[in-house]
Amino acid sequence: MISHTPEVQDINSFSRFEFLKETYGIIWAFIPIFTPVLGITIGVLVIVWLEREISAGIQQRIGPEYAGPLGVLQALADGAKLLFKENLFPSRGETRLFSIGPSIAVISILVSYSVVPFGSHLVLVDLNIGVFLWIAISSIAPIGLLMSGYGSNNKYSFLGGLRAAAQSISYEIPLTLCVLSISLLSNSSSTVDIVEAQSKYGFWGWNLWRQPIGFIIFLISSLAECERLPFDLPEAEEELIAGYQTEYSGIKFGLFYVASYLNLLVSSLFVTILYLGGWNISIPYIFVFDFFEINKTYGVFEPTIGMFITLAKTYLFLFIPITTRWTLPRLRMDQLLNLGWKFLLPISLGNLLLTTSSQLFSL
């Protein structure tokens, strides 16, 4: 009898190698999907912790301190609590609209992260219309809020959904005009090109100095889009109990808060990209690496330090919306609409005309 043990071992090792290769390929295919999701999740948890700590400091009290060191895990504890709570449905409401509304609000905002360049060569999709894609996708979120308000069969919820839709329409136009001014200055609507256009003159090349009026209008409009104080009329507790969230419980109730913080984070990221130079920094860090003769790591170092700079600018900017929550009173609905249509819209139009004129004269 002839033994074929070496051949059998070779076949087994080859099949094991092919299996490992296929497994590695599957895991590698999912890494680009799970990495941004993990990063966004951590970013939202950091925002929640920052808001609670800053709010506690402003009110001269102690913030969360029991869940993890310095209360870092408090947001995870709240999320776990909502995850295991019962999902209740209104007796005479539209069940489909009631269930789909929160998902539309979250998914539409998550898609916006696909065009955000976190650093050099760290962007999922570099489109020629990146900034306008963000505006188009973010305008879908109020539709989900309106569906939630209508499907709840509650007058407070329906009024909250109507307010969210009216507020989004009022402030979407000034926001778009400010973005259009930035596109004219950069000769591109790609988020990557806009950041690179600000890198020519370092710190003084940021669009913040060339578009100060546009920056202020963009800041106010983004606060209104995120429904942050003083623009939180869709969920005003004193008037509408909780607005479109009134009939929700459990994980669906938590999805609205996730959508709110996701929207706040992506708005702050776009402020960093459009006005604060993105991943660029005026310090020439590359010369430090040349001096220590470690140029081989530059391919890894540049995207990493770029992502760190982008996130640092973003979280520093987040102090503004968090602070305004405890310093400014809520506007009335008529004041909010007047501010959007009678003030911000004409000023943003004038800013666009000035930008267009300056670009024409510079040719």
Curated annotation (Swiss-Prot):
UniProt main location, coarse: plastid
Localization of this protein: Plastid, Chloroplast thylakoid membrane
GO-annotated molecular function: NADH dehydrogenase activity; oxidoreductase activity, acting on NAD(P)H, quinone or similar compound as acceptor; quinone binding
Residues spanning the signal sequence: none
Main EC class the enzyme belongs to: translocase
Spans through the membrane: 30-50, 104-124, 129-149, 248-268, 269-289, 300-320, 336-356
InterPro entries linked: NADH_UbQ_OxRdtase_su1/FPO (IPR001694), NADH_UbQ_OxRdtase_su1_CS (IPR018086)
Membrane topology: Multi-pass membrane protein
Gene Ontology BP terms: aerobic respiration; photosynthesis, light reaction
E.C. code: 7.1.1.-
Gene Ontology cellular component list: chloroplast thylakoid membrane
One Pfam family recorded for the sequence: NADHdh
Keywords of this entry: Chloroplast, Membrane, NAD, NADP, Plastid, Plastoquinone, Quinone, Thylakoid, Translocase, Transmembrane, Transmembrane helix
Annotated catalysed reactions: a plastoquinone + NADH + (n+1) H(+)(in) = a plastoquinol + NAD(+) + n H(+)(out); a plastoquinone + NADPH + (n+1) H(+)(in) = a plastoquinol + NADP(+) + n H(+)(out)
Family under the similarity heading: Belongs to the complex I subunit 1 family.
Primary role: NDH shuttles electrons from NAD(P)H:plastoquinone, via FMN and iron-sulfur (Fe-S) centers, to quinones in the photosynthetic chain and possibly in a chloroplast respiratory chain. The immediate electron acceptor for the enzyme in this species is believed to be plastoquinone. Couples the redox reaction to proton translocation, and thus conserves the redox energy in a proton gradient.
Subunit: NDH is composed of at least 16 different subunits, 5 of which are encoded in the nucleus.
Protein name, entry field: NAD(P)H-quinone oxidoreductase subunit 1, chloroplastic
Encoding gene, per UniProt annotation: ndhA
